[in-house]
Design a protein with these regions (language model features):
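Glycine-rich phosphate-binding loop signature in dinucleotide/nucleotide-binding domains
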Residues: 2, 27-32, 107-108, 147-149
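Core catalytic region of metal-dependent phosphoesterases/phosphodiesterases
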Residues: 4-98
């Protein structure tokens, strides 16, 4: 019997380079075959240049998040612990520029869509409904599912209470 293929997914790193190192070491020790990151590398108390070096060193497949986009376009620099392009090395800037909004990775024999929000919309969210926020149909998610490339995705949801 073939060994199970294990995918580790991390996100919202926010330049926490020390915690990132601990997390990656933990995942590797758990036998994770491939690690992917859903973005938001920027804007945190840690060192973004070091964060990028760690991701590259560990060959982490990464996409951009909204904070990464904001950093590159000089938007929302008022957020707490915002990074600024002028304080980063060129390798970090080039790396952030190279990150796609979405990426399809092969996980074992299955394609997996990696993104920060929903598809190329890095601020889109999906979560179960509550009385204050009912589940809403997402035409963008429907489009992704209708493409048929990700057979594990389903739009079936339940809004009933137990």
């Amino acid at each position: 019997m073939a060994a199970a293929f294990k995918l580790g997914i991390i996100g919202d790193v926010h330049a926490e380079h020390r915690r990132l190192t601990l997390t990656l070491d933990y995942l590797r020790n758990e036998g994770i075959n491939q690690i992917a990151c859903t973005g938001d590398l920027s804007d945190g108390i840690g060192d973004l240049d070091e964060t990028v070096e760690i991701l590259l060193e560990h060959n982490v497949t990464t996409v951009a998040g909204n904070h990464d986009r904001w950093l590159l376009t000089e938007q929302s620099r008022h957020v707490a612990n915002a990074h600024h392009r002028s304080h980063l090395n060129s390798k970090t800037i080039d790396y952030l520029k190279s990150l796609p909004k979405t990426r399809t990775i092969t996980f074992g024999q299955q394609d997996v869509l990696l993104c920060h929000g929903m598809g190329d919309q890095d601020l889109a969210k999906i979560w179960p409904g509550t009385e204050r926020m009912p589940v809403e149909r997402s035409s963008r998610l429907d489009d992704i599912i209708d493409q048929g490339r990700f057979p594990g995705l389903s739009t079936a949801t339940s809004t009933s209470s137990p």
